[in-house]
Amino acid sequence: MEYNYYLYLIYPISFLIVFFLCKNRNKYRLFSGLILLYMASSFVGSMIGLGVIDVNANKEPKLIPILFHIVMLIVLLLPFKSYDKFRYSKLKPINSPLLRPFTYLIIIFCLIGIYGDIQNINVNAIMTDIVSIRDELQENEKAVSFTDHFSFFCKHYGYVALALAYYYMKYSPKDKFTIVLLIICSLSSVFAGLQNGGREYLIKYVFIYFVFLYYSKPEIDTYWKKTNRSILIVFSSLAVVVFAVITVLRFSYSGQMDSNMVTAMFNYMGQGFANFSAIFNHFPDGVAGGGMHFPIFVGHSFSVINLNQSINSSLSLNTFSTTIGSWVFDAGIYATVFIVLIYQTLMRYVGRRKFDLFTMIYMLWFYEFIFSCLFFHNQIFSLARLLSFVAIFIVEQLMKANSVTAKSIR
C-alpha cells in the first residue's frame, strides 16, 4: 500500500480533535453526538480507502482535498452547537388563532403527499429490479402530472408535522388524535423515498425522530415520553429491516452482492469520504454549473441519475462523496465555499432565535440536511421545495401579525 493512503486517517483524527475541544460535552450532547457520527463515518471511509473494507470506491487520497473537505464540513457543523441550548429552553406558546387552521392544512398536505407516493410505489418492481426503477425515473422525470408536482410539494412538510406534534404534546397533550395524525404525517418523506427504493430517507427519519425526542423530552408528560420511545423503537426496527432488504435486492440484482452483508452496510456509511478526493481532483470546476442541486437559481437542470451515461469519466460517478463532494462535482470548488457560507449563515440565524414552533421546524430541516451531508446532497432546490420553505416563512409572519394577548391557542 502506498504511503499517501494513510492520509485518509486525517478525517477521523480531525473530528476526534473537534470532539475533545468541545467543552461541557454534557451540555452539548447532540452536537457532540453529531461530531462522533461524522468521526465514525469518516473512520469507515478511511478503512475503505486503506483497503481494510474491500469495496469499489474512487480511492485517490490527496492532502489538499482532504483538508478542504474537513474544513467545509466543520464549518457546517459548528452552528449546531448553539442549537443544544434549546433543550434547556421552554418552547414558547403561539398566541394566534391561525395555529389550528395551519395544523389541519399541514395534515391535509402530508396525507395528499403520502397518498400520491403510495400510488407510485411499485412493490413488484422493488422486489425484482431496483435499477430499472432509477432508469424509469430518468426517462419520465420531466413527464410528471400536476398530482406528482403537488405530492412533491407536500412531502417537505413531514418535519413540520413532527414539530407540530411536539407543540401539541406540550400544550394540548390530551388531543391524542391530532398528535398521532401528525406523527403519521411526518412519514411523508419516507414514502417519497420508497418510490425509487431509496434507503437514506428511512435512516434519516429515525435520526430526526431521535432529535425530536431529544428536544421534547424535558417538556412533555410521562405518557408521551413513553409513547415516543416506543415509536422510536418500532421505527428503528422497521428501518433496519427495510434498509437491509433494499440493500440485498439492489446489490443482488446488479451482480455486486458480496456474501458479507456487513460490507455493503459499511460501504453505504463511509464511501463518501473515500470518494471525495477523486471528485475534487477531477472536477474542480464542476460539470453542471449548479444545475444538479440548485436549478431554480441557475435556470437549468442536470439529471443526477446514471451520470456515467452523460459524463465520460473513468470514475464511478453514481457514488457518494458527501454533500461537499456533490457540490464540488456540480458547481466547482469556489461555488461550494460560497454555498457552505450561505448555509452556515442561515443555520446561525436559527441558533439566535427564540425557541418556538418555527424555530423547531427550521432546526429539524437543518438536522436533516447535516445528516444527509454524510452521503450526498439529494435536497434539490426545485421550485416546489423553494415554495414550501417560503410558505412556512409567510405563515410564521402571519401568525406573528395575528397574535393575541390571551392564553396560547390550545
What are these regions (language model features)?
Residues 130-150, 232-348:
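Small-residue-enriched transmembrane helix-hairpin modules in multi-pass membrane proteins
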Residues 14-23, 158-173, 338-352, 405:
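Hydrophobic, aromatic-rich transmembrane alpha-helices
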Residues 1-90, 178-189, 205-209, 213-245, ...:
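N-terminal "leader" segments that precede or initiate the main folded domain
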Residues 24-30, 167-180, 350-361:
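Membrane-interface helix-loop-helix junctions at transmembrane boundaries of multi-pass membrane enzymes
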Residues 3-20, 41-52, 97-103, 175-185, ...:
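Hydrophobic alpha-helical transmembrane segments
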Residues 317-410:
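Hydrophobic alpha-helical segments
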Residues 2-8, 61, 146-159, 197-201, ...:
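Membrane-interface micro-motifs in multi-pass membrane enzymes
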Residues 2-5, 80-206, 210-219, 241-253, ...:
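Membrane-embedded catalytic interface detector for glycan/lipid assembly enzymes
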